[in-house]
Amino acid sequence: TKIGDKPWIAKFQKRGDSFPECRVELATMRLASECGLDVPPLDFRCVLDRDIYLIERFDRIPHGNWLERRPFASGLTMLGAHESEVSSFSYADLAGAIRQFGTKVLQDLHELFRRMLLNILVTNDDDHLRNHGFLFDG
């Protein structure tokens, strides 16, 4: 979706959902930002009594009437893994991919470590290779 001239990802509350997933995810991302992690701009709306959690797209660059796609690959792709193998990979494997493919290795390793700590502290049960990614910035 678009807000102003920028593209955003919208996550909607499920009908009949008693757990406020959108609000929890927003609060967790704001906590991540307060902890110094690299977090895109966030927003929250409530429309017709349904929560909408918004994240500004970090993988698109607006150019007038069109959007340039920033090259992106998930941790799963960067490790050459298959969905059925995700449980056999770890943060150490992601760190290895950063060392192998990264251009800001020390900065990105620090970011990965801080993300790992936050995920542990908030008991993130959705921490998997698809939720870690690499952006080409060259």
Where are these regions (language model features)?
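Conserved ATP-binding subdomain of kinase catalytic cores across diverse folds
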Residues: 1-88
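Conserved kinase catalytic-core segment
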Residues: 19-31, 90-138
